[in-house]
Amino acid sequence: MSEGLSREIGKWELVALLINVTVGAGILKLPADVQKTVGNYSLLAFVVCALIIGLIALCFAEVGSRFSGTGGPYLYAREAFGATSAFLVGWLMWLTRLAGFATLVQVFVAYLGYFWPAAESGLTRTAIITGLVVVLTGINLIGVKQSARTSDVFTVSKLIPLILFIIAGLFFISPARFTLTSAPSFGSFTSAVFVLVYVFSGFEAVLVNSGELRQPQRAIPFALIVALSTAVVVLLLIQIVCIGVLPDLANSQRPLADASFVFLGRAGPLVISAGALISIFGTLNVIMLACTRLPFAMATQHQLPTPLARVHKRFRTPHISILTCAAAALLISLTGTFIYAVKITVITRVMVYASTCAALPILRRRKAFTETSSFKVPAGIPVSIICVAICFWLLVSSDWREARDVSIAIVAGLIVYALTRIMSNSRRGAAIKETSTDYNDYVD
């Protein structure tokens, strides 16, 4: 069934969207945090996490190539496991996007404060956050093509300062700073890998927009492989430069800005801070694009109120869903109640990853949509089993407080789901009763 959405995103625009969301704000802070946890073994943690995400991305590439509709992992879970599991996947993804959006808005304001201190507090802060949400909402309302083109521009704009940082920084690296000390504990190394999932994640959100891709069965595998390969190289080189240039990386609050000061002087932090603003804005645009399509996809399946599935007659975008997400994102951004959700961002993503990896052998066995699939993972069944096991390893290594927060989110989601289903069934029953009554009026 056609969803009524315009298929305006090509494979290279999808590559840009994926790079934009993967090379996001996480790399602006995490090089120092990971270095503090495992020292120079942070490079090994980067490589291990990249391999893990690479295997998971292969599963996404095959599963994603079987579908052309909107929903991404939500759609995959519905086909493989049923409506309830699909709702939970979609619900967790949506909450994660809202919380992630609000978090990045705060980071945006903080970096803007480097140039304009008044932006960090008071009415000025409120006005900036509101204006930022309004601009992004307008971009997404006008059309997905405009949103994708905006992502193209900001992908190039934010990669330029990062590439300059890498090229210039490589000439100032001190090999002595890569000396390995005593190996970290297994728990510390696992914690570092767990945190780095945040750096490499986000690609699953973009796949929600498959219903607006041209030839999604071919575009998804191509874009995932190209974008994540590019992101891995960029992120690993950034960590290498930070370690090799900055003596006290572990205690740096702005590692890229501090490192750039070493080899670029005062201009370095200014360039990096400006690049950070560009990076964050681009990532916010991608999150807004993906976040608004999740309620749309779930509403088309009668798991959320049906108005969220309406498509604007002129712009062919889900305007009710966009406005709803914008209002929720603005509220959370201004009130700060999103903080608890930040703690569960990684664990909810890992749960989503596990569901898609587990769906691969099920869809293969059912031969679901094999006529449209254009990509098949070599040794796909063993790879999917390994990925599910890795996800389980990451989940059990998380803190108990994160597990508690995820449980709260799951319970809240199930309540919303149950209420929506009850209301939907009531309307369906009323419609059947009305039809029956109308029919009896014609019987003597």
Please report, for each region that a protein language model flagged, where it lies by residue.
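Hydrophobic alpha-helical segments of multi-pass membrane transport proteins
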Residues: L162-F165, P295, T345-S373, A409-G429
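Helix-loop-helix junctions that connect adjacent transmembrane segments
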Residues: E3-L5, N40-L43, A119-A127, V153-A274, ...
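Helix-loop-helix connectors at the membrane interface of multi-pass transporters/channels
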Residues: M1, R78, V105-I128, P161, ...
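Hydrophobic transmembrane alpha-helices that form the core helical bundles
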Residues: A32-T37, A45, G54-V133, T137-L141, ...
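A generic transmembrane alpha-helix motif of multi-pass inner-membrane proteins
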Residues: I344, T348-R349, V377-E434, Y439-D444
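TM-loop-TM module centered on a large, flexible mid-protein loop between adjacent transmembrane helices
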Residues: L75-Y76, G82, G113-A119, V193, ...
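Membrane-interface "cap" regions at the ends of multi-pass membrane proteins
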Residues: M1-A32, K36-Y41, A45, G54, ...
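Transmembrane alpha-helical segments of multi-pass small-molecule transport proteins
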Residues: F46-A50, F115-K145, L159-I166, I320-A328, ...
